[in-house]
Amino acid sequence: MSLFLKMETFVYKNFIVPLQGKNTFDFVSEHYQKGDRVLDFGCGIGSNSKLFNPVDYIGVEVDESRVGSARLKYPESQFKQIPFISSEDDKIPFEDNSFDIVFISLCLHHIDSSTCKLLFREFKRMLNQDGKIIGIEPCILPNKYFSNVFMNVIDAGDYILSIDEYEKMYSSESYNIDHIDIVTTYGYHLWQYSAKPNELDSNSYVGGMTKYRKLIRPLHLTTLYGKWAVLIYLLYLIIVPIIN
């Protein structure tokens, strides 16, 4: 695993996941019942596996090193490396109607809209008739300029969107969205939602980086990100109470 990924994983594991805490547990508990078959897409190092009964759960990830870390830390759960989905011909290696829930936590904002649309089609194929997606993503909020910039500084994802844009992207692949909540944890605004497939036809959607990301992205093209990510986060924790 590269230094960049190690630093990002450190921040995610030691700050973002613990700070979500009970909010994520309560959110998942509203939708998941023991016996539901769950696909955790973009499971990373497996931290969310403990939200589900191990026999119900399988986590998938394209990064082999993260799958290895997840297997070591959570041996009671199942993890699988999957190929990157980049065309209509690429498939996630599971049968149709295999899952009751697709869980997506802090993943989509790393993926461009054209690939998200391909993934949404695959999720629809793999979900059973009453199945749904439940997800958590950082979101841009109106008039929250400092935290909107902060999320883009600390996060490696290029596509932290507004809730409206996330909804448009899902709707373009025939999903109905149920807005659940917005949880704020030390500068991260986390949108909790569910999405269920409908029978409408798909339509076009082309998204991209927000103005915040376009401003911040050059920082991520240097070697400074991994070196300074934790320091920036700690400075934020110090500064926010002062300015508020």
Question: Where in the sequence are the language-model features?
Answer:
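Class I SAM-dependent methyltransferase Rossmann-like catalytic core
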Residues: M1-K22
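Conserved alpha-helix/loop element of class I SAM-dependent methyltransferases that forms part
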Residues: V17-K34
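Conserved class I S-adenosyl-L-methionine
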Residues: G35-G44
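Class I SAM-dependent methyltransferase SAM/SAH-binding core
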Residues: G44-D90
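Short conserved loop adjoining the S-adenosyl-L-methionine
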Residues: D90-D96
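A conserved beta-strand element that flanks and buttresses the S-adenosyl-L-methionine
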Residues: F103
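A short glycine-rich, Lys/Arg-flanked "PGG" loop and its adjoining helix->strand segment in the class I
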Residues: K117-Q129
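C-terminal alpha-helical "lid/dimerization" subdomain adjacent to the S-adenosyl-L-methionine
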Residues: G135-E173, I177-L190
